[in-house]
């Protein structure tokens, strides 16, 4: 499978945004995606992950058969679950270490540090059962559920794409009601509603599976689609920017509220957010495709590619670095802009450096271990 450098760059950009967004005192968090789009880096990462799943499935099924593709994503669901469990333990230990050094931080709940020290086995158990999803890692719980469904549902999507899309939409419509029945430590189900976010994830998968059929079919209508997509993105951007102006922009906000209904929830995946990111995906894939390729080939783009290619490992590192960065920016109190900016830059460089090391040493080692296991089997 040929890698798409723009895809890797965007995945890396999403991870950098996620890291900065989780650092409350960050100076650069005011320039992340969420500040000029109605959706944020979490939606971008889930959509791109779905797209990558579709591409990989198609490649593996073509070369090795459907059973191999199903097994690959069943194993991947386990790997994400394992990352959720051990990442949660490690994050709690890091938090406990920071508190022991009298370094306050607000990126994660302090109670995790208490639990991992007082009852590590119990804390491991609630993570392993996914009864508890620590903040910053809670999106992985949804990702586990969605990936676990891939071996069963992707064959259905391939065989009955229209019926699958209709079913996915109906499930999204009832997402808030269904999520309340999911066993969880908090009332109302998982924070990231899997019944809502499946629409975005499987939209990405469909784009990856059928991109060679979809793009040629849509190209005759590219002008209209570009206008509609740009309009949808601009609509969402106007909502976000108008909210920042407060009272002076109240007439504009009231007018916009008549269209979108007054509330745009993230956790159930509001329709406005979904349409905005789908519109943005068309803009990136078609009218801005060459621009994205040039950006991805630049030095900064290559660095973001390396972060994006780190995948799950890079995600865990971005979470841990956001906790450390938050602590460094809070302690001592009253830091100036220059010092907080220095921490932002340190966190981004560290994420890139660790991701590059992983690609150079960690990923090849992981592949060799997997190859030896498959050879013995």
Indicate where each model-derived feature is located.
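Alpha-helical transmembrane segments and their immediate juxtamembrane cytosolic regions
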Residues: 1-377
């Amino acid at each position: 499978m040929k890698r798409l450098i723009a895809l890797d760059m965007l995945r890396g950009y999403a991870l950098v945004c996620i890291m900065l967004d989780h650092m409350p005192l960050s100076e650069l968090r005011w320039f992340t995606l969420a500040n000029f789009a109605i959706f944020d880096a979490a939606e971008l990462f889930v959509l791109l992950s779905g797209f990558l799943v579709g591409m990989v499935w198609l490649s593996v099924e073509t070369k090795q058969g459907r059973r191999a593709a199903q097994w690959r994503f069943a194993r991947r669901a386990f790997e994400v679950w394992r990352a959720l469990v051990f990442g949660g333990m490690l994050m709690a230990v890091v938090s406990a270490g920071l508190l022991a050094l009298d370094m306050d931080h607000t990126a994660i709940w302090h109670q995790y540090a208490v639990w991992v020290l007082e009852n590590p086995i119990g804390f491991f158990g609630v993570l392993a059962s996914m009864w508890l999803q620590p903040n910053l890692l809670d999106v992985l719980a949804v990702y586990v559920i969605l990936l676990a469904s891939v071996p069963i549902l992707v064959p259905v999507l391939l065989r009955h794409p229209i019926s699958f899309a209709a079913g996915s939409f109906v499930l999204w419509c009832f997402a808030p009601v269904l999520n309340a029945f999911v066993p969880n430590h908090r009332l109302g189900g998982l924070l990231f509603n899997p019944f809502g976010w499946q629409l975005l994830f499987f939209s990405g998968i469909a784009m990856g599976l059928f991109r060679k059929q979809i793009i040629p079919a849509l190209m005759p209508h590219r002008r209209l689609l570009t206008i509609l997509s740009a309009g949808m993105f601009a609509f969402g951007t106007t909502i976000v920017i108008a909210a920042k102006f407060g009272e002076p922009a109240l007439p504009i906000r009231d007018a916009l509220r008549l269209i979108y209904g007054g509330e745009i929830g993230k956790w159930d995946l509001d329709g406005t957010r979904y349409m905005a990111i789908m519109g943005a995906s068309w803009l990136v894939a078609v009218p801005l495709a060459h621009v994205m390729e040039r950006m991805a080939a630049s030095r900064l783009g290559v660095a973001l590619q390396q972060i994006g290619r780190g995948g799950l490992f890079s995600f865990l590192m971005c979470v841990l670095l956001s906790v450390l960065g938050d602590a460094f920016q809070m302690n001592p109190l009253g830091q100036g802009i220059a010092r907080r900016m220095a921490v932002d830059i340190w966190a981004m460089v560290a994420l890139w450096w660790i991701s590059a090391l992983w690609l150079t040493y960690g990923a090849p080692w992981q592949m060799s271990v997997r190859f030896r296991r498959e050879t013995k089997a």
